[in-house]
Amino acid sequence: RYKKMNNETVKQVTIKELYDLTETAAKPLLESVTYPWEALPKIKDFIIELGNSLDPEEYEKRGENIWIHKSATVFDSAYIAGPCIIGKDTEVRQCAFIRGSALVGDNCVVGNSTELKNVIIFNNVQVPHYNYVGDSILGFHSHMGAGSITSNVKSDKTLVHVKGADFDIATGMKKFGAMLGDYVEVGCNSVLNPGTVIGSHSNIYPLSRVRGYVPSNSIYKDQNDIVTKH
């Protein structure tokens, strides 16, 4: 069914196809790899390096390896562990739980009871209500509806593959949530299974169970009903 990919690059799931890198402080990291998931093991060290280079006139250091822009709003009940960077004009709302290795961009919303772990969140992203985002990258202006989550470990604990209609990429990774391209909309209470990659400008129906690759400019109704936007 699938073409096993070894040295051949699958263009549609590359960083260049999914993201506008001018909309993230992680641009140098993402430019150093081909596929977005290849950046996941490097997020922690990148944040520490970047954080130590930030202008202290703009970013306040709150605890070990935690840098928060002075224009950002962090509610008292939020928990933030380092390493972490919170960008300009971002809101971290009540009871948000940031477990570390989180690079959150400008003008973002990390909402009520949302949990982040080992993530790159581009500018203008909203994860506003009861979301779990782990070992994932969310592109510019993407939005996850209430209760939608990225599942980052398979139930049988085997290594994650990224699969499309005609390709199968072995990532060699046990923990891999989802890669959302720019302007992706995920409907409420959807589950993005390990290894999900959603192309830019695509919409996911509420209550969806998504796995594998969803092409850009698509509407995902269910696994067997993915239509192109017109």
Residue ranges and their predicted role:
Residues 26-27, 121-123, 128-230:
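Glycine-rich hexapeptide-repeat left-handed beta-helix
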Residues 62-83, 211-212:
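N-terminal capping/interface segment
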Residues 79-80, 97-98, 115-117, 132-134, ...:
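Glycine-rich beta-solenoid repeat tracts in large extracellular/virion proteins
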